[in-house]
């Protein structure tokens, strides 16, 4: 799928070096089709890394996509320059009158805080409310998933005895569900979190589509098929967990070595990426079956989910 992003976005050169089709703005303007409008609400400190990971996965389909990047306005990121944020990112006030075919809400490194103590919680809740009427389908990732389950359904998060960090085996619970089409009987997903949700707490119109014995529910979807909650990080690069581990070591946090990740459990050994194909499948299936096939041609007709 050609993704239409600003010509000078750093992710563009990275993706082009990987032979991923990135369409420049001028060429996109001359395409006689309606592209999918996708909003990425990026809450991660490493903006460029997260943008690149998600854009890489959105590129695996034949439909053109226009991307908007959204940042918080009530909290200013300390890890990304203001010039960068102002150049490439929009605030909620700038996009709140717009409709989107799909939206992705990332994780955030704030999971040990009570939700209401997060500096941008009020703004985050306003955007969650807005997403119900202005995004046809929304995918929530890690903290974004836990926080949305809490806000929309009142489902609490539960602290873990120690951080879940590593690559874990998962099983699909509904093999023929369109979101999991093409998934193997066992697939692998990275996790990196201190909190979880209990399957017994999931209620209402929520359905668990995939789970892990070690990490619990991993892919959850609403019965209306417009909200997806992924508790892990299929978007992660090969070295993301290694970089997190080394970062925490340098901070003196005594992190556990990510499970099932480094060969022979040796942090100096190069890890293998075991989740690449299923990451592509999940994002491609979501885009095809729950965005492209379902969203109205006239975006103004998108209503409450």
UniProtKB/Swiss-Prot annotation:
The active site is at residues 142, 233, 235. Gene3D superfamilies: 3.40.50.880. It is an enzyme of class 2 (transferase). It is found in: Cytoplasm. SUPFAM superfamilies: Class I glutamine amidotransferase-like. GO terms for molecular function: homoserine O-acetyltransferase activity; homoserine O-succinyltransferase activity. The record marks 111 as: Important for acyl-CoA specificity. It catalyses: L-homoserine + acetyl-CoA = O-acetyl-L-homoserine + CoA. Its EC number is 2.3.1.31. GO terms for biological process: methionine biosynthetic process. InterPro entries: Class_I_gatase-like, HST_MetA, MetA_family. Substrate binds at residues 163, 192, 247. GO terms for cellular component: cytoplasm. Keywords: Acyltransferase, Amino-acid biosynthesis, Cytoplasm, Methionine biosynthesis, Transferase. Pathway: Amino-acid biosynthesis; L-methionine biosynthesis via de novo pathway; O-acetyl-L-homoserine from L-homoserine: step 1/1. The record marks 192 as: Important for substrate specificity. Belongs to the MetA family. PANTHER family: HOMOSERINE O-SUCCINYLTRANSFERASE (PTHR20919:SF0). Transfers an acetyl group from acetyl-CoA to L-homoserine, forming acetyl-L-homoserine. This is Homoserine O-acetyltransferase.
């Amino acid at each position: 799928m050609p993704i239409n992003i600003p010509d000078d976005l750093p992710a563009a050169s990275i993706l082009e070096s990987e032979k991923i089709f990135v369409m420049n703005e001028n060429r996109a303007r001359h395409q006689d089709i309606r592209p999918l409008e996708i909003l990425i609400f990026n809450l991660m400190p490493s903006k460029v890394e997260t943008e690149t990971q998600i854009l890489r996965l959105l590129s695996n389909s034949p439909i053109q996509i226009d991307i908007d990047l959204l940042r918080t306005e009530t909290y200013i990121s300390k890890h990304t320059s203001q010039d960068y944020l102002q150049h490439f990112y929009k605030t909620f006030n700038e996009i709140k009158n717009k409709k989107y075919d799909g939206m992705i809400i990332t994780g955030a490194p704030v999971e040990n805080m009570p939700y209401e103590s997060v500096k941008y919680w009020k703004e985050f809740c306003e955007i969650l409310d807005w997403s119900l009427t202005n995004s046809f389908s929304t995918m929530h990732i890690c903290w974004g998933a836990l926080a949305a389950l809490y806000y929309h359904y009142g489902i609490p998060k539960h602290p873990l005895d120690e951080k879940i960090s590593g690559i874990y085996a998962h099983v699909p619970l509904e093999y023929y569900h369109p979101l999991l089409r093409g998934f193997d009987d066992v697939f692998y997903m990275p996790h990196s979190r201190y909190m979880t949700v209990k399957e017994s707490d999931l209620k209402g119109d929520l359905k668990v589509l995939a789970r892990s014995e070690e990490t619990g529910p991993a892919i959850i979807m609403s019965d209306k098929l417009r909200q997806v909650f992924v508790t892990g990080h299929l978007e992660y690069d090969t070295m993301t967990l290694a970089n997190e581990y080394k970062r925490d070591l340098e901070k003196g946090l005594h992190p556990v070595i990510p499970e099932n990740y480094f060969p022979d459990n040796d942090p100096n050994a190069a890890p293998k990426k075991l989740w690449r194909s299923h990451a592509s499948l999940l994002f491609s299936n979501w885009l095809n079956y729950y965005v492209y096939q379902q969203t109205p041609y006239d975006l103004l007709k998108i209503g409450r989910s």
